[in-house]
């Protein structure tokens, strides 16, 4: 069965985020996974709204894949801590979207 993979990374303040998330999205999809991509959420909501939605997506995911540079995102750091706290499986992606 395919894994449900949530992509975590920096969105706010990164003008390249759509390209980075799309690249990781396609990589995971090509591996046969179902991709949960927060870059596809509508714009214009408050950060707390996004976090609530993203944590629900993480709860539904089998695995959370972190993009390079996630540490510089307050939201992704919360997601990482949430994964650690709840025992969610995680992996770090390399610069190309490949596993490190």
Kindly label every feature range from the protein language model:
Residues 1-100:
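Conserved catalytic or regulatory cores that recognize and/or transform ribose-phosphate-containing ligands
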